[in-house]
Amino acid sequence: MKEAIIEWKDFSFRYETQQEPTLQGIDLTIYKGEKVLIVGPSGSGKSTLGQCLNGIIPNIYKGHTYGEFLIKGQAAFDMSIYDKSHLVSTVLQDTDGQFIGLSVAEDLAFALENDVTALDEMKGRVYKWAEKLDLLPLLDQRPQDLSGGQKQRVSLAGVLIDESPILLFDEPLANLDPKSGQDIIELIDQIHKEEGTTTLIIEHRLEDVLHCPVDRIVLINDGRILFNGSPDQLLATDLLTQNGIREPLYLTTLRQLGVDLVKEEQLADLDNLSISKGQVQLRTELVKETPELQSLFRLEDVSFSYDDRPILKSLHLDIKKGEKIAIVGKNGAGKSTLAKALSSFIQTEGRYLWEGQDIKGDSVAERAERVGYVLQNPNQMISTNMIFDEVALGLRLRGVDEQEIETRVYETLKICGLYEFRNWPISALSFGQKKRVTIASILVLGAEIILLDEPTAGQDQKNYTEIMEFLEELHQQGHTIVMITHDMQLMLDYSDRALVMVDGELIADTDPASLLSNPELLVKANLKETSIFNLAKKLDVDPLALTAFYKERREGCKLN
């Protein structure tokens, strides 16, 4: 008989500061040794459920509870945070916020030191988990100096060392390149099997998590459980798209091909789908006019070093008017440093030419009138309380006349679909709307290039679509879009040029489909092909032709 380890029985929770409950009537049992994926759109309540589990609620965030919530048969909210920490270990989305020690070894030992573990036992357990997670060469390094994938391994080792029976992962893929994300999912699966833990994963990137099997998926929206069952059962419905979660790309493509998925029993595993070779016929030549574009911003022999360590190495890049460019590569490849160089946040060697004119001497303010840099988190860019004031801030700092400010701000707000909210407080906006405000604040300065760092990271399908369709509108109006991204589907859907960076060098400049069909290049850059390419192998069709078919359906291109 299965043993219940976590139980919510008609459980509701309301934050002290809110009038309506965030969780409503939750009935959910997690059994010992299960691996469960929890999905839902932004604001659905899934993170609140996780915070109830690990003790952040009620120890940090207070509120009112109704119903029962049990961990191993005990009332969870009656436990001390110390006792609960020995039952539930959490790996946070922001790994940097989880590090305590000055070295990897110190960080791994932290929980054991708190438990006054004997020194010999402490050293043995640190060595055991460092060896298991391939961290032995890194024990003397600072956690903050590691790559994204290495940081995730350190965070995971830091909680595994306590050997808690329940592991909770809060969006473990949010800041990782595709290959590192795949490696972490495989590592979580390995630990789950070897240690027999009960594993809960909260994540937007459903297809990436399903790279390894899960026992169940729980879909939450508006604080209620809408689905609780197997991945195959969920994928056979349209609940994902109805609730703002992106379904696996291979399923979208199969639907476009007219394949009847209702009869399929193993939708979560592409390899086991019953579709056969030769079932689909595609013509292979994609005809799409590519107009000759004019050079806008050219970099020549740009290099940058930090503490004598080269970060950018002799980069040559020509950004042309009206392009949509994706900059991709593994964590630490130099993508963000390149963005800082484009924005004049750092001083580098080399030449910067804007429509043929040397602009290397631009100040940050002058460069912002050419290249608008939008950070991943809009809350890190927002400086005022009201929408109008935020968009007007850059003009006011430049001493522009107030009447001209009003004219330019109103015009920009209309372009960004924010005019009706002009007198609203920013706190009342959704994440996607806040992103629009930050883009408006750079557009009002006249920026022709919009440079975005991970424009959709951590966003559900609704926010993702809202942000990207808005960028498409700006592109249609003549803006050049440059995006740093780890999302291969975003690159495929929304860019026409891919720049691949590895160790500070630009190793490829190609179109997205060609990149995704080049295994050697993908390995070098820690990227991975989309599931369209795996589907093409299964159907025995040209992956470029299948990708072209998918994009035709999406963009209205013509196939011949």
Swiss-Prot record:
> Which parts of the sequence belong to the ABC transporter domain?
6-247, 297-528
Please describe what this protein does: Probably part of an ABC transporter complex. Responsible for energy coupling to the transport system.
Matching SUPFAM superfamilies: P-loop containing nucleoside triphosphate hydrolases
Molecular function (Gene Ontology), one example: ATPase-coupled transmembrane transporter activity
| Localization terms from the record | Cell membrane
Q: What is this protein called?
A: Putative ABC transporter ATP-binding protein spr0430
Please tell me where ATP 1 binds in this chain: 40-47
Give the matching CDD domains: ABC_cobalt_CbiO_domain1
Q: Which residues form a coiled coil?
A: none
Q: Mainly resides where?
A: membrane
Question: Per its UniProt record, what PANTHER family does this chain match?
Answer: ABC TRANSPORTER ATP-BINDING PROTEIN BC_2655-RELATED, HEAVY METAL TRANSPORTER
Per its UniProt entry, what is the enzyme's top EC class, as one word? Answer: translocase
Q: How does it sit in the membrane?
A: Peripheral membrane protein
Where does this protein hold ATP 2? 329-336
Superkingdom is: Bacteria
The similarity comment for this entry is:
Belongs to the ABC transporter superfamily.
| Entry-linked SMART domains | AAA
Please state the Enzyme Commission number of this protein. Answer: 7.-.-.-
Lineage of the source organism? Answer: Bacteria, Bacillati, Bacillota, Bacilli, Lactobacillales
Task: Keywords in alphabetical order, please.
Answer: ATP-binding, Cell membrane, Membrane, Nucleotide-binding, Repeat, Translocase, Transport
Q: Which GO terms describe its cellular component?
A: ATP-binding cassette (ABC) transporter complex
UniProt xrefs under InterPro entries: AAA+_ATPase, ABC_Co_transporter, ABC_transporter-like_ATP-bd, ABC_transporter-like_CS, ABC_transpr_CbiO/EcfA_su, ECF_ABC_transporter_ATP-bd, P-loop_NTPase
